[in-house]
Amino acid sequence: MIPQGTVSHRWRVSYRHAESMGAHWQQPGQSRTRLERTVCQHDAMPPEFVTSPGGPRVATARTKLLVSVGAAIVGGTAAAVAGAGRAAPLIGWDILALVFGGWVWSTVWRLDAESTTSDAMREDPSRDLADVVLLGAAMASLIAVGVVLIAAGHASGDLKYLQAAFGLASVFVSWTLVHTVFTLKYARLYYTGQPGGIDFNETDAPDYRDFAYLSFTIGMTFQVSDTNIQTKQIRRTALRHAWLSFPLGVVIIATTINLVAGLAG
């Protein structure tokens, strides 16, 4: 634990990066002492939780992921016992994605720019691992969607439409989770290391909703719109993001066509 009134070296470095942006991120009346006091609270917290400025303790990415996986196992097992068959793994995945995504957005949606800065700068080694696990699982879930759609093709009556709609909803859940993960990643890249890197064409510092705008725009159009990416690291991240978004978009379109054709037939 770091004594009150002192700041670890890594946070001094991060502070200098943030300070270099000056009015670009600081709000009127904010002092260096206030930021240092907040940073000390971060350093003193146990690894599973940190304290957001002016708010309650915030769970780490690892905690969110573990809780979500636990909920998925329980839900998927219950679905299998209830007779869901091949759809049970996909039900488990949907529960994981909904729990993790809902937890994230309930935490970050109302954060202002200052709180977004603090949250994004928070050191959490489990974040990168959580990103890899979630993105990999989201892409793998497309296989489960294919299995459900094949089963829907051999089903009859209302069950056919129910399975097709379930497949479409599952792809949408995976699609949303992918862009949620990249929303958090863009915020981390912007506020840590080399500060900045994304020009939102305004003087106010960006919050998570601004990064969500960038992330979901890439997810829907495979390109940036009225924001300018200014660093190689963020540009390469955006390239990977667009590359992952394409198969998800294709599957959503294909699933929608399959559902509409089934309803028309």
Describe the residue ranges of each PLM region.
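Membrane-water interface of transmembrane alpha-helices
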Residues: 101-113, 180-192
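Loop-to-helix transition at the N-terminal end of transmembrane alpha-helices
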Residues: 86-102, 106
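Short, hydrophobic transmembrane alpha-helix segments
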Residues: 76-90
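Pore domain of cation channels
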Residues: 210, 214-217, 227-264
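Juxtamembrane helix-capping/reentrant segments at transmembrane boundaries
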Residues: 116-136
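Membrane-proximal soluble regions of multi-pass membrane proteins
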Residues: 190-192, 196-228
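The first (N-terminal) embedded transmembrane alpha-helix
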Residues: 59-79
